[in-house]
């Protein structure tokens, strides 16, 4: 046979080989969509220096720490401060040679009085690591926490003005993180026009405020208290000379302080929220409001009125501004703790960011898409004093209990009608996860 001729069998083999190659090429892993890299983490990177932190802890902080094992940042005064740096943990794709990568800044939750940049319970570390493995440069930031408490004896209160001032400080910090990324884009291998935010709860509020609040006058003038230090401009700390606002944001159960600041802003956002959220309300209201008691003391919290995802979505829809939503009917706060919703929420977040990061024009890529889902009632029932729990349905379900630092302290399996004894746990705050059910936070105090 001539060397220039190919048999029918050989031709089929060649075609099959080509088809296999083409199929493999088409299914190749894609940056920003698939896991491509190992991840390198650099802790405590300074993104702003000489920033004033409140430094006079209130006695309630110590009481709660000793009784519940949880640190809540309450302070006696704003007039005592200590200048310290703002820090972030930086996650980068190992061995990546790309010079202009999309970046994501993640802000934890915690009602402005708790939470941390290395908080595994809030998906902060998970999101940073997972996105960096997909080719992003990511950062988990530690914004300033803490609000002043007034009162004496056994009765204390937090004023809505003081809460508003705390939020403003957090907005300053998120803005400083954006400017750090943008100013140091070449050094970090970041595209300054593709810097995005993810925020959880209070972190979502800060992220949305970064998108929509453009100047100091967008915030209420009542925050300027005569007996407290001046807060300064939004961009007073950290890098200067570059824009403070991100190119897109994911708000997990977030809100804004004034619906009018949205204006004609076209920045793409993804809003994720449960309709029965009583912490950051889905529509309009005062988060965390009410009275709390511990060890004979009462703490009354007054917070500013906030406008939740329903209001933001309604305004953006009326203005025909492209954005995305994922609303779950009947779900409460932080429903990504639910086994049922953990992956759907992550998929929504990652797909939204992929569309932004992979487009040439990151300012106009979000497709209007409103999604509603239906949540079911929890089958978990906590017993007296949280010393045990029951499961109302299911068989041989896996459960896990983690402490406030995200460490597993108890695991097992349980079935409907069975009680699980928790008396071996020490005093503290825990998260209970049962397969297929919404996670429950509970505390043990004896």
Q: How should these model regions be labeled?
A:
Residues 401-409, 430:
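Short, glycine-anchored, charge-dense loop/turn motifs used at functional sites
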Residues 429-446:
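C-terminal tail/sorting-segment detector
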Residues 306-364:
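C-terminal catalytic histidine-bearing segment of alpha/beta-hydrolase fold enzymes
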Residues 96-101, 107-151, 257-259, 278-282:
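Short substrate-entry loop that stabilizes the transition state in hydrolases
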Residues 358-386, 392-394, 445:
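Residue-level detector of functionally pivotal "anchor" positions at catalytic/ligand-binding pockets or at interdomain
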Residues 29-99:
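N-terminal cap/lid segment of alpha/beta-hydrolase-fold proteins
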Residues 271-273, 277:
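Short beta-strand/loop motif that positions the catalytic acidic residue
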Residues 168, 172, 176-265:
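Primarily recognizes the serine-hydrolase "nucleophile elbow" in alpha/beta-hydrolase
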């Amino acid at each position: 046979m001539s060397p220039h001729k190919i048999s029918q069998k050989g031709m089929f083999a060649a075609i099959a080989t080509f088809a296999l190659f083409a199929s493999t090429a088409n299914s190749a892993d894609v940056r920003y969509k698939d896991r491509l890299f190992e991840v390198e983490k650099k802790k405590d990177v300074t993104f702003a220096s000489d920033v004033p932190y409140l430094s006079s802890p209130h006695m309630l902080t110590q009481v709660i720490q000793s009784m519940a094992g949880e640190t809540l940042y309450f302070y006696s005064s704003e007039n005592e401060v200590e200048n310290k740096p703002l820090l972030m943990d930086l996650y980068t794709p190992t061995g990546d040679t790309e010079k202009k990568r999309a970046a994501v800044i993640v802000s934890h939750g915690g009602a402005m009085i708790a939470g941390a940049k290395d908080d595994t319970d809030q998906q902060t570390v998970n999101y940073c690591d997972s996105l960096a493995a997909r080719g992003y440069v990511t950062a988990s930031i530690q914004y300033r926490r803490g609000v002043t408490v007034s009162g004496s004896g056994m009765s204390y209160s937090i004023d809505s003005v003081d809460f508003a001032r705390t939020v403003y400080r957090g907005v300053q910090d998120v803005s400083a993180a954006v400017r750090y990324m943008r100013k140091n884009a070449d050094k970090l291998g970041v595209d300054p026009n593709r810097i995005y935010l993810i925020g959880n709860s209070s972190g979502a509020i800060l992220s949305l405020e970064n998108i929509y609040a453009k100047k100091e006058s967008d915030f209420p003038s009542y925050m300027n208290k005569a007996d407290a230090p001046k807060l300064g401009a939004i961009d007073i700390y950290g890098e200067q000379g570059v824009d403070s606002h991100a190119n897109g944001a994911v708000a997990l159960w977030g809100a804004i302080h004034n619906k009018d600041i949205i204006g004609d802003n076209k920045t793409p956002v993804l809003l994720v929220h449960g309709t029965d959220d009583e912490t950051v309300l889905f529509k309009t209201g005062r988060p965390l409001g009410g009275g709390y008691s511990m060890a004979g003391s009462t703490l009354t919290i007054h917070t500013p009125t906030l406008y939740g995802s329903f209001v933001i979505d309604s305004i953006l829809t009326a203005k025909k501004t492209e954005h995305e939503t994922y609303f779950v009917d009947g779900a409460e706060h932080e429903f990504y703790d639910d086994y049922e919703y953990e992956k759907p929420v992550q998929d929504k977040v990652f797909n939204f960011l992929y569309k932004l990061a992979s487009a040439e024009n990151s300012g106009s890529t979000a497709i209007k898409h409103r999604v509603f889902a239906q949540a079911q009632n929890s089958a978990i029932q906590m017993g007296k004093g949280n010393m045990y729990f029951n499961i109302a349905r299911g068989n041989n379900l896996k459960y896990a209990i983690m402490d406030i630092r995200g460490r597993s302290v108890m695991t097992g399996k349980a079935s409907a009608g069975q009680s699980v004894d928790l008396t071996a746990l020490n005093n503290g705050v825990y998260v209970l996860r049962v397969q297929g059910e919404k996670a429950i936070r509970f505390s043990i105090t004896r």
